[in-house]
């Protein structure tokens, strides 16, 4: 510890600084899209509790766009390829408190290297998840992950304001009228066809069946890796269905979700972005399960899953393909049920 830090610890201890609001926080969550969006209530509520505080957030570079327009943050730090450089940057910032919402080996290393800063670490419940996925015994608390994130900062006096998730889109990345077909300007259903793992995604043939049954214009959302599947689905009706996969940035895709009449999504980041905009969501689950505590937060939603499958959940994240080869958790999903629910929600939306 250098002399300046030593002086500050003696004459300006964190406990006294926090009472005066003259306090500096670092929040850590490296990935991924949905997980970072799910931490946004912590950012907002921390700011409400300590309006005069300095609040920074450390994440991976590819996810920085999720946070860079967040008005409750003062700075977004990027995880460097050189880990020691990241640790040095954290030390140079002289934080009073570090809020670890990732709690992995990297954050443990940070904690071990920066011993003079109080750490508040999120409980990931990995052992309980392992028991659930391997033995199908659910001992997880029936608590949403957002509320578990909030529990991490309870000792700092931070209280959940109940306002849900945040997602802020800069004006420069909002979608213009000319960016989507004229046929979709008066309303559309956004379907997020992607996911980080294939076992979280409906097969293309199932999605083709779904869009055939939906009577309203549809915009397909996903990354460049989903472009080919999007083209196959859009072939069903090229006028009704617009394949936006790989054509827009994350923030632009978020804006398309923001303006949608209804969002249909797998258990993925776009579902949580939709929840931030308080959209009605039809949430389709494959190998993962809602009881992991990551359903859409503080918005209207319906869950679609194949119940009473002995093999679910098979993973807390997902696989490239079904470990048993049958993929019943998605192949047995009813597209009639999803389409009927979609039309019900859309009917209410039009009447309003």
Which role fits each region the language model picked out?
Residues 1-352:
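Catalytic machinery of carbohydrate-active enzymes
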């Amino acid at each position: 510890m250098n002399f300046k830090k030593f002086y500050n610890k003696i004459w300006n201890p964190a406990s006294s600084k926090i009472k005066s609001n003259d306090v500096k926080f670092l929040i850590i969550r490296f990935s991924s899209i949905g997980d970072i969006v799910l931490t946004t209530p912590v950012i907002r509520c921390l700011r409400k509790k300590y309006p005069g505080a300095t609040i920074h957030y450390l994440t991976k570079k590819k996810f920085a766009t999720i946070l860079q327009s967040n008005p409750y943050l003062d700075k977004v730090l990027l995880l460097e390829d050189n880990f020691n450089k990241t640790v040095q940057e954290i030390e140079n910032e002289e934080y009073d408190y570090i809020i670890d919402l990732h709690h992995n080996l990297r954050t443990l290393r940070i904690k071990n290297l920066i011993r003079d800063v109080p750490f508040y670490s999120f409980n990931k419940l990995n052992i309980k998840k392992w028991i659930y996925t391997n033995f199908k015994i659910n001992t997880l608390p029936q608590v949403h992950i957002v509320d578990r994130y909030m529990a991490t900062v309870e000792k700092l006096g931070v209280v959940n304001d109940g306002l849900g998730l945040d997602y802020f889109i800069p004006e420069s990345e909002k979608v213009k009228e000319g960016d989507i077909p004229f046929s979709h300007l008066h309303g559309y259903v956004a379907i997020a066809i992607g996911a980080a793992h294939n076992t979280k995604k409906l097969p293309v043939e199932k999605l083709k069946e779904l869009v055939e049954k939906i009577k309203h214009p549809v915009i397909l959302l996903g990354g460049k890796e989903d472009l080919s599947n999007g083209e196959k689905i859009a072939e069903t009706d090229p006028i009704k269905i617009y394949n936006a996969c790989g054509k827009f940035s994350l923030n632009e895709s978020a804006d398309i979700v923001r303006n949608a009449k209804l969002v249909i999504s797998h258990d993925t980041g776009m579902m949580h972005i939709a929840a931030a905009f308080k959209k009605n969501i039809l949430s389709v689950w494959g190998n993962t399960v809602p009881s992991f505590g990551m359903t859409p937060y503080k918005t209207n939603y319906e869950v679609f899953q194949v119940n009473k499958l002995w093999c679910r959940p098979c993973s807390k994240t997902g696989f490239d393909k079904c470990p048993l080869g049958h993929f019943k958790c998605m192949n047995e999903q009813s597209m009639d049920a999803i389409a009927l629910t979609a039309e019900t929600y859309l009917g209410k939306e039009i009447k309003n």
